[in-house]
Regions:
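Short, glycine/charged-enriched secondary-structure capping and boundary segments
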Residues: 36-37, 66-70, 96, 148, ...
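Histidine-centered metal-chelating micro-motifs
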Residues: 60, 80, 111-113, 220-221
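Short, flexible hinge/linker loops that cap or flank conserved catalytic cores
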Residues: 46, 127, 206-209
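Conserved N-terminal helical subregion
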Residues: 1-86
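Conserved FAD/dinucleotide-binding core of flavoprotein oxidoreductases
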Residues: 4, 90-188
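Conserved mid-domain beta->alpha element of the FAD-binding
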Residues: 53-54, 81, 133, 168-172, ...
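Short beta-strand or tight-loop elements
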Residues: 23, 35, 108-110, 193-196
């Protein structure tokens, strides 16, 4: 059984004070002087800081301020359809084959995998857990906007969350699963009432720090999910940055951080592309 994202989130979120975790104030851009870094927010306000750590993911707004140039993530040519459902929602025959196994099926230009994860509150007891499936499928860049259009007709740049997928698109997904997948996996796809979708992107930063700015996690390296190292990579970045800041002046700490983590990010990103090239 694997741990789930929401379990990790709650564990770390509990360590942060309410006043230190601010929602609803999106950052538009980042800049800096010799004395401070500045955040320009979408609401027109500004915040000043000694150091800004951009842990803002695939669409990072901190990234261009670090690299000094436009630095978009590059679409890799395929998407991951995903489902996360109570194990009790699986038909009995499918559950007997899929639960407590890392199941995998490959076909031309596509593959699907699935595994059991903890329940919504970290439950590990049989019957209280969830089943997570991921179905990789090739989608042309020209079709991507249509696939990432939500129920309100808005086009999203990277993903659709649970509940955002139009029912008509879900029905097509279920029908495709019935035609293309083994019955246990097809049943798992059909059992998910709110599938979600993640487009797969690549990005490698040429640098992780600049002045009073640093990149961390997917803001620095967007790696393919096949590596199963996205969380571990970000955690490694965070621990390395913390270690440096705890013992060195910030400028020296950032240099040490980049020296340690940049080659690791390059290696993981390369490994992910190798795995993705085997799709199908």
């Amino acid at each position: 059984m694997q741990i789930s994202w929401d379990k990790l989130y709650r564990a770390f979120r509990a360590l942060v004070a309410e006043d230190d975790y601010v929602l609803g104030r999106a950052v538009r851009s980042v800049s800096q002087t010799e004395k401070a870094a500045r955040l320009d927010l979408e609401d027109g306000s500004q915040e000043m800081a000694d150091l800004v750590v951009g842990a803002d993911g695939v669409g990072s707004v901190v990234r261009p301020a670090v690299t000094g140039q436009p630095s978009p993530s590059i679409y890799a040519g395929y998407v991951a359809w995903r489902g996360l459902l109570p194990e009790s929602a699986l038909p009995v025959q499918s559950a007997a084959l899929l639960l407590d196994r890392f199941a995998f099926y490959t076909m031309p230009d596509s593959h699907i995998l699935g595994y059991t994860v903890t329940g919504p509150n970290g439950e590990t007891e049989t019957g209280a857990r969830r089943y997570n499936w991921v179905w990789y499928r090739r989608i042309s860049e020209g079709e991507l906007g249509k696939v990432l259009t939500d129920v309100q007709g808005h086009v999203h740049p990277y993903s659709l969350a649970p509940g955002q997928l139009p029912d008509s698109r879900r029905q097509v997904l279920v029908e495709d699963a019935a035609h293309l997948l083994p019955p246990p996996f097809a049943a798992a796809v059909a059992a998910e009432r709110q599938p979600f979708i993640q487009a797969i992107f690549d990005y490698e930063t040429p640098r992780m720090t600049h002045g009073r700015l640093a990149l961390l996690g997917d803001a620095a390296f967007v790696v393919r999910p096949h590596t199963a190292m996205g969380v571990a990579k970000a955690a490694g970045d965070a621990m390395a940055l913390r270690s440096g800041l705890a013992r060195l002046p910030y400028a020296d700490a950032l240099q040490a951080y980049e020296r340690e983590r940049l080659p690791i990010g390059v290696e993981i990103a390369s490994y992910g592309r190798q795995l993705g090239a085997r799709l199908g």
